[in-house]
Amino acid sequence: MLCAQSLYANGFKIQEQSLNATALSSAYIAGARGADASYYNPANMGFENDWGENKSEFELATSLINIPGFNFDVATNNQVLYSKTTLQFNKNPVIDLGPLGKMDIEGLIKLGAGIFESLNDLFKPIILEHSTPDSQIVTGGTGDTALVVPKMFYKSRTMHGITFGGSFVASSGLAMQWAGKGGEFLQDVFIMMVEANPSVSYTINNRLSFGFGYRVMYAMGKFNNVVYVPLDKEGGGISLNQEQIINLAKHPEAVNALIPESIKNQIGPILNKLGTLSSSLIIPGCNTNGVECVNWGVLMGNVDGEKTNLFGTSKVYQKSEGKDLSTGFRLSASLRVFDNGMLSVVYNSPVKFDMAGKVEALTYVGGAMGNVLTTANLNIAVQMPEILALAYAQEVFDKRLRIEGVYERTFWSRGWKFNVTPDFENATYTGLSGLVALKDVFSSETLKQMVGIADFGVVSNMGAGWRDTNTFRLGLTYKSKNMRLMASTAYDAAPSPQDKVGIPDSDGYMVGAGAKFNLRGFDFGLAGSWTFKQSMSSLYHSGGLGGLFIYTASLGYRW
């Protein structure tokens, strides 16, 4: 696949928030100046901006995030689903055969087996196929995705070494609709994380500065997707007691749907041969091509118990949503090296979310069994990772050219990335069709037992196996009295495993460019950042390069 085009821009963080960061591929830490320093490096708010001023500043930026459409091929998780049912017959003589007296159902079957040997199959498990598997490779795709995201940045004038600032950004987000069998896993996804970040810095002698930012983040998400869940790995199965089976016998049309054709084709001829002796086992006035219709309800009434095991995977269509408010912090420090260099370090703490919400999961058992709707409370555990960045910027050619290099370590391996935990214990279970819709047979507790054999743990943690990553950024800024020109490149490693179905991604190679102009206290500009990804390193293949493109425009005012 085009690797979800960085689905969340390598993981689920989008670093390119301001115009400067977009143009510089986020190689903008030691060289951060002005209003957006409140977000990227609060310590630098205390230094003069690139126009040589100590002023209050406000900047409004708007980004267009574009993910080009793509098609892809991926291995499927959809296996065949079949059931194996074992019946325990009543030993009491409950069937009246007239002159032959009464006989239990097992005796009747053995009597018939003397004529039709294959009737012994009734003592064997009844095997029914509920679904067919997909081909090993399935195709998916999505159209172009475009998001418009506004952002704001502010810093005050520095007084007595103290500077205040703040920012409001969308630090993560995604809205995509995936089509086809291959796209079912992320069929309709919307994620939004917004961050308000008040900050303060203290600068000593225009040489050493410390900064602190308090991160207040709100996260929400809505997800409609399809997963294929393994069933009954422990072999526990589903059991009906005698009362439930007696109630099932009251629905002969439902029972009839459960009996394999091979057995139906043998019982009818036996009843024909028995004639009036089998009157209690036939439906009066009903025959097909001269063969009596069997009253399967009466037969099932003579079953003490049953056990059904399900094998393979069941299709589950999920609709879920969740939201949460959480906090973190940002620490930074900058040291001026001689007159033309700046060394900076920035630490972003992890921000943990427990997004509370609801989930509706429709489990497709299929066949005569039908489908079960589960409604439950839900918790989605997501952690924005901690990030440590080390940067150095050097100004040359009479401070007209700034060269900045950034090393960034993102600790993806710590904490949950996308762990979904439904409260199945206190959920509501409803049978929507087939046998499971018979409330006198399948109680809520039985439906709970049925859903309980599904191994949702296989698909509940889509961030499993993520690793810490390194990012390397290089930016160039040319400065004149009324203009700044910027260009950059970066390499951003993907945290997610490339050989698993989950949140897909692959390493990104970035380039950026932009310009900002100064006019009578105002500044305005345009910038672009282009991330390219090679799909062949991912489990999701499409060939060629994927892309994540960000275009940012800004307008600032200084006073």
Model-predicted regions and their roles:
Residues 4-6:
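N-terminal signal peptide c-region/cleavage motif recognized by signal peptidases
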Residues 8-25, 98-129, 138, 147-559:
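Outer-membrane beta-barrel porins/channels
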Residues 29-31, 42-51, 155-158, 173:
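Outer-membrane beta-barrel pore proteins
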